[in-house]
């Protein structure tokens, strides 16, 4: 983990929320094959070339899972105050029906899941509540594979854990559509 912390080109972009700029509450980095641009939260990310360590992780993961990943989003949670809000990884650049592999390194954190809100016109059911959500405690070295339907039906997020002082890295290997 120390090698990744030191060798990655970390950024803390700003996003527009209700007309105001806010720093993303974590550090991020985007790596991938040439042409694997990725837009989320209104930001366009150009891929940095794979480092040797990241390329080796990609190779090992691809062999183990029988999947071909061409991009990687890294999130660095410096302590328990860094977090990620509710979202689904459903951007049009992502290859449909391709799983996302999420590798956790460092401090344990709880990844929360809740049913994805449906448009009001389509849903006659009650809105999702906290009782409908669940958490997965992800420890150092855990690998979570989110198969394609996950993003269609669920949102996920990483809430703050304010007493936590240790760092956590999350590496999410993805497949971007190529032109």
Model-derived segments and spans:
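Non-heme Fe(II) oxygenase metal-center motifs and adjacent flexible, charged/small-residue loops
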Residues: 1-179
């Amino acid at each position: 983990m120390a090698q990744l912390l030191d060798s990655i080109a970390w950024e803390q972009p700003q996003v527009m929320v209700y007309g105001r700029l806010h720093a993303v509450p974590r550090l991020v980095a985007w790596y991938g094959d040439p042409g694997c641009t990725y837009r989320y939260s209104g930001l366009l990310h150009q891929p940095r070339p794979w480092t040797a360590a990241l390329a080796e992780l990609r190779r090992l993961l691809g062999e183990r899972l029988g999947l071909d990943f061409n991009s990687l989003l890294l999130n660095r949670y410096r302590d328990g105050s860094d977090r990620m809000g509710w979202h689904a990884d459903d951007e049009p650049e992502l290859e449909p029906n391709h799983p996302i592999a999420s590798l956790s390194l460092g401090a344990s954190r709880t990844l929360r899941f809740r049913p994805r809100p449906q448009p009001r016109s389509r849903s006659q059911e009650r809105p999702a509540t906290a009782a409908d959500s669940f958490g997965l405690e992800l420890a150092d070295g855990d690998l979570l594979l989110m198969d394609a339907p996950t993003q269609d039906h669920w949102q996920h997020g990483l809430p703050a854990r304010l007493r936590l002082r240790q760092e956590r890295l999350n590496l999410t290997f993805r497949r971007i559509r190529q032109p």
